[in-house]
Amino acid sequence: MRVNNLKRTLAENRPVINGWLAIPSSYSAEIMGHQGYDAVTVDLQHGMIDFASALTMLQAISATSAVPLVRVADSTPAQIMRVLDAGAYGVICPMISTAEQTQRFVSACRYPPEGVRSFGPARGLLYGGADYSLHANREILTLAMIETREGLINLDAILETEGLDGVFIGPNDLSLTLTGTASAESTHPEMLSAIERVVSRCRDKRKIAGIFCTSGTAAAQRIAEGFNFVTPANDVMQLGRASREAIALARGNAIPTTGASGY
């Protein structure tokens, strides 16, 4: 089976830089995959992407050096299994708040006896190789999103779930639930404390600590804080930012420092 290079990168104590796709286009997925990202994630939760589009995007990413990942819309086992069959080498699952939810998520990603994933890898065989089913349980990456107060309370139990590789903070939802305002770069004391705790517990339990960021600068700061899996904005945010900068430069204006959210 084709190895999951993200696990090698993390084992060498190098951070994973992850691209993020919300635009339903295999062409833009291919472009992003060629930019040097370690991984590129197809977003089925907040991205404007259906399964048919996701399939072609995963095919496009597979032609690059980036590892193809998917954020599923929810923790429904059928959806998780389907994106894995389509060739995703990892799943980011939103709104995980308990150890029980984590176990169900991980189980859907693993073939028996470690889990309940149904056999039918389809494109997984094409991308992963003929021995896919023998090694998929080891290679497929599992990240549970921490974005609720309940998830923070149950963080230790979530991280102790057998087969879970780590967690990925959804900062907008986490900020919304903790402070009443959605802000990926919130400096509210409760938000800062929550982020510090996630990093600390992941380090102690040797798990991946991931987070969505609004820019490369913000991603670098998160790495300095101890995160080892960062997403420096999504394609919508990057396209908008590049366009605003180009327009400002053409008009001789100051480059804007803020803009619309990627969602």
Regions inferred by a protein language model and the residue ranges of each:
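Expand to "…catalyze enediolate/carbanion chemistry for C-C bond making/breaking, isomerization
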Residues: M1-Y263
